[in-house]
Amino acid sequence: VGILALYYAHGKLTGDYTFDLLKLYEGNYAYHLQWWVFLSFFLGFAIKVPIFPFHTWLPDAHVEAPTAGSVILAGILLKMGTYAFLRFNLPLLPSASITFTPFILILAVIGIIYGAFLALAQQDIKKLVAYSSVSHLGFVMAGIFALNQQSIDGSILQMVNHGITTGALFLIVGMIYERRH
């Protein structure tokens, strides 16, 4: 819905109806449009990240997935949501990004703490690593929405670190599962 709204808004501004991202970046969209498009993008991207409280699917997905699926999910796919915030929300919707920053920072901090405490309480190793991912991606989101270049660079580095280490952790967990069952 948000993508279609940008398509029509860009067409009304310039007469050129397009989905070309580089052309969409050039649009100076009204604040109320940015607000609604940001909200629609946020919902989809927050589920993909997963940011608290949209994280509930992740532990079950890791438990049910084979080892290779967990490695791909943790190592690559979770970062697609954070990348989408960097690629779409910040440059396309700058005013709405600033408006939503306090809300997202609060969710990120809650996710950091909540994910860490839930990870500590887990008996299943896959769930432990999954909840630690919720916590780590909270740090990434907090860095992205600190809205300065240094924090965004740190978030990108954390995404790479998380992809490598969590992927490796799921490989180790997979080896443990293979030997125990």
Q: Residue ranges of each PLM-predicted region?
A:
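Hydrophobic transmembrane alpha-helices and their helix-loop junctions in integral membrane proteins
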Residues: 1-181
